[in-house]
């Protein structure tokens, strides 16, 4: 049995969510909606990817549908989310990956077309945010619109949870060195709300804001107000890294901290939080399915209560995997799977 899924928005996350969904037998993507991409171009965009490589299966069109590995996927081109005929193909769970409909009010438009649940693949100002491995125990089936938070929150929260549960976080600051995303500019251009954000991503390190650290306070309430952060956008295509500096309540050696993270990576956070002692760099994590991979050899400690921890994440592939995981979890809790 598989839950029938629709994807709204066939951009970076939409396409990689589909690649991830095809690997999960509990997910059946039956439709994609994107008013800005013609069907033939969808085939091309799904087949070729500058970061994750060529799709290893078959992709073609037939009868106005997208055919992936012989599987038919209906294609719609509606700009109005409320006009997408999800019910015509039986799609009940919708991945909202346009980056446009990120509030409950806007994302709820999908319900008009027959959807039962919407998973926003971005942070939301008002929808409940869930991070796999961190706060799924607070899931409430009554909410028709939920958020998978951000890729950075998905990296930071599991690590912060381990440290907070084991040693207690008094306060912390986070920096994410973040790969390029689609909203950035290839050459300098106007950006009235974010002047630095209007500068060319090519050849620049760009300081930026991020709500990822504060969002951890929403998924781990006991950390609310104890954590904030910022971002540096850098000219790499994929894979980002979190630098978490925290002061702990309990004294601990760096080896004790490493041991706690390693234990969690093999136990309750297996598949979510990874652990490595190898001397790695960013490209080593392209295609890594973990939300967060703790780099044990990159961190440093000033004293037994003050430490800098490093965690990598494929901000495209790893995050998209969690979108699919959250969708499956919700479907099971809702009794749809």
UniProtKB/Swiss-Prot annotation:
Localization terms from the record: Cytoplasm
Residues forming the catalytic site: 151
PROSITE patterns: GAPDH
Pathway: Carbohydrate degradation; glycolysis; pyruvate from D-glyceraldehyde 3-phosphate: step 1/5
Chain positions recorded as NAD(+) binding sites: 12-13, 34, 79, 315
Broad class of enzyme this protein falls into: oxidoreductase
Transmembrane domains' residue ranges: none
SMART domains for this protein: Gp_dh_N
Gene that encodes it: gpd
GO molecular function, one term: NAD binding
Catalyzed reactions: D-glyceraldehyde 3-phosphate + phosphate + NAD(+) = (2R)-3-phospho-glyceroyl phosphate + NADH + H(+)
Name of the protein described by the UniProt record: Glyceraldehyde-3-phosphate dehydrogenase
Lineage of origin: Eukaryota, Fungi, Dikarya, Basidiomycota, Agaricomycotina
């Amino acid at each position: 049995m598989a839950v029938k899924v629709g994807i709204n928005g066939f951009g970076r996350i939409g396409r990689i969510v589909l690649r991830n969904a095809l690997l999960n037998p509990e997910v059946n993507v039956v439709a994609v909606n994107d008013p800005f991409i013609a069907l033939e171009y969808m085939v091309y965009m799904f087949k070729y990817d500058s970061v994750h490589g060529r799709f290893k299966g078959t992709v073609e069109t037939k009868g106005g549908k997208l055919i992936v590995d012989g599987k038919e996927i209906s294609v719609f081109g509606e700009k109005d989310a409320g006009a997408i005929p999800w019910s015509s193909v039986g799609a009940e769970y919708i991945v909202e990956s346009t980056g446009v409909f990120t509030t409950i009010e806007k994302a709820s438009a999908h319900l008009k077309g027959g959807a039962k649940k919407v998973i926003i693949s971005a942070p939301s100002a008002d929808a409940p945010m869930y991070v796999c491995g961190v706060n799924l125990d607070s899931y409430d089936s009554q909410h028709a619109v939920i958020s998978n938070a951000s890729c950075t929150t998905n990296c930071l929260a599991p690590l912060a949870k381990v440290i907070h549960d084991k040693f207690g976080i008094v306060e912390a600051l986070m920096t994410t060195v973040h790969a390029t995303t689609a909203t950035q500019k290839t050459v300098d251009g106007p950006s009235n709300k974010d002047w630095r954000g209007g500068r060319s991503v090519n050849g620049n390190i760009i300081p930026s804001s991020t709500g990822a650290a504060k969002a951890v306070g929403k998924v781990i309430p006991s950390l609310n107000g104890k954590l904030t952060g910022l971002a540096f956008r850098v000219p790499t295509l994929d894979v980002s890294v979190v630098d978490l500096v925290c002061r702990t309540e309990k004294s601990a050696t760096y080896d004790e901290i490493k041991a706690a993270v390693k234990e969690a990576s093999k136990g309750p956070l297996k598949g979510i939080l990874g652990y490595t002692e190898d001397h790695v760099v960013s490209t080593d994590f392209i295609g890594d399915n973990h939300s967060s991979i703790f780099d044990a050899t990159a961190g440093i400690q000033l004293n037994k209560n003050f430490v800098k921890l490093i965690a990598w994440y494929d901000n495209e592939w790893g995050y998209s995997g969690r979108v699919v995981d959250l969708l499956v979890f919700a479907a099971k809790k809702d009794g749809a799977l």
